[in-house]
Each structure stands twice: as structure tokens, then as C-alpha cells.
Amino acid sequence: MKRRLVLFLIFMVQFFMAQKKVEDYLHLGDKYRFDNKDYKLVWSSHPMDNFYKQEYILPNENVEKYKRLILIDFIEGDLAPKDVLSSLVNSLENSKKQNLVINYKVYEKNNEYMIDFIMSENSQDGKEVLILERNVYRYFRINTPKRKGVLLFGVSDRAYTKKEMDNMFSVLKNKKLDLVNKVIQIEVPKIK
């Protein structure tokens, strides 16, 4: 009897979790088009009064084990893109001490900033790379009558197997700027 009750409770929790609607805090819609593909809004958060996060993946992917994820964050306030970027660069520099894979390049043009960085999640003993992740983030200053702050548009690519990781390193070696150029070409997402 206890086992049935536990199974029923687990089922109910999963059912209600599946019913939870993802909030479109930035009013961008439940789909976002990038690189001729439609990504669906699968996760969002409003962890602080002035901070919003939204994540999009391809319909056939899982947010816990995605190949590519689009992230759009907005920090409201009198902030400059350079300051928000500096915070990430400081974090990467501090993490480099424990994670030798971390590497990054910052781009700046017309007071807009981008960062292209690679990092990894390693096994507890540090001998094996479990996840290899490449991110390209672009920072925009938003200054409209309704919203002021910094918007981050990011693309996160992940590799989980040795073959996928080798492919990612090959792309970084031979076609590194392809993704950077695609992110450069996007229009500023129109948040409301």
C-alpha cells in the first residue's frame, strides 16, 4: 500500500511539474528564430526584481542535455554592457585556476560587447571532461521609455561524448568565427 501511495505521489508531482507554464517575462514569444531554426521557450526565471532569464532549445532537445541553447537575459537598471561583461570575465579568470579548459576572447565595437568562451564540467577527480561548453554572448544597452538596462543574447553549444568534443574542437580550430558572425548579425531582441 505504501509503495502505491509513493508511486501515486511521484506521478502527481511529475504531472503538475509538466503542467507548469513557462513565463515569457520579456514578451519575446514562446519561439525564437536563430540560424534558420525555431527554438522554443522552455525555461524562465525572475530571480531578482531587476533580473530576467529565458532559455530556448530546439523542440527535439532536452534542457538538461541540449546541443544548442539560446539564452536571453535582461538586467534592468543604469548599467553599461562593459560592466556586465567585466563581471563574467572576472568569474572566468577565477575559475581558470580549477578549470584549465576555460578560454575566452572579448570583442568590442561601437560600445557593444561580445565574448566567446569555452569551459567544461569535469569529473570529481578532475581527470575527465564530462561536458564541454562553448558560449557566445552579445551584450546590448537597452534604453527605451519602458525599459533601461543590459540585454544579453547568448548561444550555448554543448558536447557530451569524446566524438562530440573532438568535433567542437575542430569547429573552434577551423570555423570559430562562424558562430560569432551569426550572433553579430542578429537584431536586438525587442523586449517589452
Give, region by region, the residue ranges found by the protein language model:
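Sec-dependent signal peptide recognition
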Residues: 2-8
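Surface-exposed amphipathic alpha-helical segments
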Residues: 147-192
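N-terminal "mature-domain start" segment
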Residues: 19-49
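Glycine-rich, often proline-containing surface loops adjacent to acidic residues and nearby aromatics
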Residues: 64-74, 114, 146-155
